[in-house]
Amino acid sequence: MFIIKSMLYRLMQMIVVLFVISTLTFILMKLSPGNPVDKILHLDVAQVSMEQINATKDKLGLNDSLLVQWWHWMNHLLHFNLGKSFESKEPVTQILFNYAPITLLISFSTLVLSLCISIPLGIIAAKRFHKLSDKVIRVISTLSISLPAFFIGIILLFIVTNLMNIDSVILSQFILPVITLSLGMCAYIIRLVRSNLLMLLQSNIVQASRLRGMNERYILIHDLLKPTILPIIPLLGISLGSLIGGTVVIENLFDIPGIGYLLMDSIKSRDYPVIQGCVLFIGFFVVIINTIADLLTLLLDPKQRLQLGNPKSKANTPLISESSDRHA
């Protein structure tokens, strides 16, 4: 029952945050320079009568008070109506549906590649503590965190296009961006896995399993893997959300037709409805992904449930579930 209450509480938090994001997006567009009517009627290059200007304002609801405009904005948002682009006259929702798949594909591919690389490397670094392999992995992780993603992308582009003379759309618009985004994400996961595993290797349950004659692989899989990976879930939620925002630079660097590319192009042309749609998409995605990560952590981690169920409980709750005593 408590888990259901906690899940409902997090869902309510998500709704409140989404409401705030929607309101801030509305305010941001109202404070932005320029007039939508000027953009729609092309007043900078065309002669338009005052009747046409007033008719356009009435159609857009610009003559209403800000409160009424906000109410209409929220009502349209609930019906997935984000208006039409000033440039192409297409519905913004349809434009987002056209550009979002490539951004989501790159983001989730980055997540999968990062997990496949970082978890094994983090385990190796912990198992070979202070040995050569551990030092090499830590140095590479530090470099990956220190270098900006766009700088790594420029280096990869130079190597592939100039030195190797490879001209491939899949390579330049999918493989290289995924590698570029994965390097920084891998570094954080490697360090988290390494630190968690080093702490768990000193636990009493692991020592007891060794005394019972269990081999290291068995201990790793049955006693250490789950408590090592569980703390990664919240980090993945934050990282995946930031990946969507981070693709703004990477998509423009690699000329990828995704949400980030669309956002920059809309800013240049001052296409406000599309800008609103892109900001809302990124904000909503970040909030939803982080909420899912929190719910997964709550469902899978007994320690989290115990601490939430008993706020006075101390942080010294065993990191490894006592179910490991089944080996006894």
Curated annotation (Swiss-Prot):
Membrane topology type: Multi-pass membrane protein
Molecular function GO terms recorded: nickel cation transmembrane transporter activity
The UniProt record lists the keyword Transmembrane: yes
ABC transmembrane type-1 domain sequence ranges: 100-297
Parts of the chain that traverse the membrane: 11-31, 104-124, 139-159, 170-190, 229-249, 279-299
Compartments in which it is found: Cell membrane
Keyword Ion transport tagged: yes
GO cellular component: plasma membrane
UniProt keyword terms in alphabetical order: Cell membrane, Ion transport, Membrane, Nickel, Nickel transport, Transmembrane, Transmembrane helix, Transport
Predominant localisation class: membrane
Domain of life: Bacteria
Gene3D superfamilies from the UniProt entry: MetI-like
Cross-referenced InterPro entries: BPD_transp_1_N, MetI-like, MetI-like_sf, Opp2B
Record-stated family: Belongs to the binding-protein-dependent transport system permease family. OppBC subfamily.
NCBIfam families noted in UniProt: Opp2B (NF045470)
Function: Part of the ABC transporter complex NikABCDE (Opp2) involved in nickel import. Probably responsible for the translocation of the substrate across the membrane.
Quaternary context: The complex is composed of two ATP-binding proteins (NikD and NikE), two transmembrane proteins (NikB and NikC) and a solute-binding protein (NikA).
Annotated protein name in UniProt: Nickel import system permease protein NikB
Species of origin: Staphylococcus aureus (strain bovine RF122 / ET3-1)
